[in-house]
Amino acid sequence: MALVIDRGRLEGFEHRDSGRALVTAGLHPATGGDGSLSCSGDMLLEALVACAGVTLRAVATSLAIPIRGGTVTAEGDLDFRGTLGVSKEAPVGFREIRLGFELDTAATPEQIAKLLELTERYCVVYQTLRSSPVLRTHRGDPGP
């Protein structure tokens, strides 16, 4: 079992992620990669952190909650034996993903609770992961 973590910083109205602007995908070190490339699990968590950070900022602005800064962290449990085909019992993909926020704010606990509730509600990546949309594999043009 490996723990994959991504963390980004809240700065102004932007979200600065630890990822790279141009991303080259490769194998995770636990599957034979050298660690210099982003694995798909890294990119999934980076997308969640970025979306949650931007959404949190937008919701905070809408609710007039001042956020001076903070961090957004996503971490997930991934058993690489599944994706490597080593164990048929090991699932392919994350078993659990946890999203955490450390906020520098004078907001009340009630305001923070509302902020996080609405961030979950309006974060596209969070809702996509939570809802498990229909996903199809195809060859050629995906069409409608």
PLM region descriptions:
Residues 1-46, 58-144:
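Extended beta-strand/beta-hairpin segments
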Residues 55:
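Classical protein tyrosine phosphatase
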